[in-house]
Amino acid sequence: MTMKRTISGMIGTGSLAHNRRDFIAENVDPDRVQLNICYRNENLKEVYKELFDEAVERYNVGKRKDRQITNYYEKIRQGKQEKLFHEVIFQIGNREDMAVGTEAGDLAVNVLDEYVKDFQKRNPTLRVFSCYLHQDEATPHLHIDFIPYVTDWKGKGMDTRVSLKQALKSLGFQGGNKHDTELNQWINHEKEVLAETAKQYGIEWEQKGTHEEHLDVYNFKKKERKKEVQELEQEKEHLTAEKEELTAQIAESRADIQNLKDCKSCSC
């Protein structure tokens, strides 16, 4: 019997520590952490060296020292044009119809596991360095973190470089308008691939127009960010109050010093 389920694909925040479970968030079941599947967990800086060190050497040949690139990782990290890496999250169904620990949830795990096996082969210009299937939250889902790059670049800069637009273009995705970017096209394509895999397990993609269901993890992270902002604002207010108090104390001390000087002058 065929079951209908939604398929979600969205850009994640890229919290590598969260994905590795270096800390346990509120929405994570500690008793299920051992069920998570780690497909890849590589050091981001080391992967940057692997991908770009030779290109950096070629670029630096004949360049003045002040124009040479000494650390491409830091150049991208401090720059504004590209991100160090991107994350995409995929999920089938939701907590009501594909909850972890249920028969349907286990089926979702099998589908996601099958889907991710050919991800790197299918997307050679998106170098995956971190990939996890989480089964310790409300619904099974995949976190795939990758570095988009292009080789044999003929434009300005290094011949091998970070570029989401060019990496996706080389995979055949040409952006249209702001609602039809290369990234949106690619995510929709990957959802279709996931849907084909799901079909083999008796799951039909239930499409709900352009409105996609948000992942539980996304809602949690959004809540956490709001909480962090509120805490920072409170800390700012506290520091501002401290600063004002210190300023008043300094002014008072200066006045006392001036009074002492005046008294000393009078006694003379």
State where each predicted segment sits:
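N-terminal nicking endonuclease/strand-transfer module with a His-rich metal-binding environment
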Residues: 1-268
